[in-house]
Each structure stands twice: as C-alpha cells, then as structure tokens.
Amino acid sequence: MQTSTKTYCIIGDPIHHSLSPAMQNAAFAAKGLNCTYIAFRVPEAELKESIESLRSINIAGFNVTSPNKAPVMKYLDELEDSAKKAAAVNTVNNIEGIFRGYNTDVYGFIEPLRKRQVDFRGMHVLLLGAGGAARAVVAALAEQKGVAKVVIANRDMQRAEELANLGDGSGMKCEVMPLAGAKDVSPMCDLIVNATTLGMKNESSVIDYQNIQKGSVVYDMVYRPLVTDLIENAKLAQASVVYGYEMLIEQGAKAFEIWTGLSAPRDAMKKNLLGIFGEPT
C-alpha cells in the first residue's frame, strides 16, 4: 500500500457478511481514487480501544454497524444532525483529527421509497426491531409528512419503549408490542420494515404471507441473502418489495460523498453488489 493511500473501514460484530468493502472499493476504483476499504471485527466490549486505535493510525473515515451504532456516539468529537435525530451513527469522517459522526442510514432508508413515490400520508407502519438500524427508520419517517402511526415490535420491550419515545419526541405516534405479536397487526399496515437481523441466517420471518396486505410495501433491511423469507412472503401476498441492497447502496453512496466530496458512482456500486448477488427476480 502506498503511503498516500487513504484507508477506510467498517467496524462491527459480526462483520464477515458485510459487502461494504467490496462496494466501496468498487466505488473508489470507478473514481480512480487511491483509497482502500477493509473490515474489522469489533465487539461492543472492545469499541473504546478500537476507536483509539483508529485515531492512532489516522483512519480517513469508517462505517459502523451492529452492535456499535449507538455506543460509538460517546467516543466521537462531533455529531451531525442526522446522527443526533437517530441517536445512532453509521458513518464517521476524520476531519483533521476530528471524528465527526453521521447517520447515512436515514437517507439510505428513505431514498428507495422516494424513488417509488410512496405516499406517507395516513400511513400505518410496522417496524420490526429497535436497534441502531430501527432508530434510523424512525428518524427518517419523522421527516415525512403525515405518517399516522408506527408500531415497533421487538423482543426487548425496554429498547422498544426507548425508540418509541424518540419517535414521540419527533411528533410521531408510536406504539410498542412484542415481536411475536407482529403478525397480528401486519395485515393493517401499509409499510412493513424489518430492521432486525432475522433472515440473515435464512430464518423464517415472524410474518407469513397471509398477514401481509396486498398492495402494501415490505422493506427488508437484510441484504444477504438478497431474497429473505419475508421478501418471499411479500411477493406471495402481491405486496411491493424493497430489497436491503437498495438501502445498502444509498447509505454507502452518501458515506462516499461525505468522505470524498465527490458524487458517488452508484451504477458501479450496484453492478458490484448484483455481481455478488445476481439480479433479483
């Protein structure tokens, strides 16, 4: 590696599944940049020491994934508005030694819905999960006009309540329920979002196709495998689907732009990912 090479990375645990290195390295190559992007496994218990190590090597920037999106905030120097609203960080830029945190998941989540011209007015949303990814969903939905209600279904009810309070503070009506009961409310929902890791290991979804409304939108943030059980069920129910890779590209593109100041080569990023996945049918 040349001394002038800028190094970026992603930190989380587990990390072996991450496609961010392949996608971002494809983006750097497409723009002819002397940059490289690697993955580091960082459990939450080792987060403080890992951030200190990244400072010591003068890392150019990095992404943060589960379980570190909320805990990392206290080790950063500055937070951009998106990170404050989501109370979570997924992107950090090193600005002359200042670690500034952003949440590009907020933009990354909403952009595929905007492209589909989804109407949020009067919308009832079912959100599965209450972790860092779910925080970005709530922050993104709070910026849309007219969302009627968000039901947060999660195993840990305390975390669900904390997220509901975040949503309520943004002017949205939020309710909580156990994850196991999600199928009871899903038939009444216009948008179903999976912000858990359920499906990453080919697990069955907590919502089967009989409990998905025809014409609703089902959004699975899991991107590997490309087609999860929830996505399969959504297709059977004749719902519209949003794939996790779409959010991955958009949040990654925004991170790329923060780091480089250049427009992201989205086509190259998408081509790289779909070369790994294969085109969805």
Residue positions per predicted region:
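Residues at the starts of beta-strands that form the adenosine-phosphate
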Residues: 7, 36, 124, 148-149, ...
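Glycine-rich adenosine-cofactor-binding loop
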Residues: 12, 101-103, 121-143, 154-159
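Rossmann-like adenosine-cofactor binding region
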Residues: 170-241
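Short, conserved loop/helix-junction motifs that constitute active-site signature segments
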Residues: 2-4, 120-121, 144-146, 207-216
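Conserved beta-strand positions in the Rossmann-like core of class I SAM-dependent methyltransferases
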Residues: 38, 151, 242
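NAD(P)-binding Rossmann-fold cofactor-contacting core
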Residues: 144-170
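Phosphate/diphosphate ligand-binding glycine-rich loop within oxidoreductases
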Residues: 2-116, 225-227
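Adenosine-phosphate binding glycine-rich loop
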Residues: 221-281
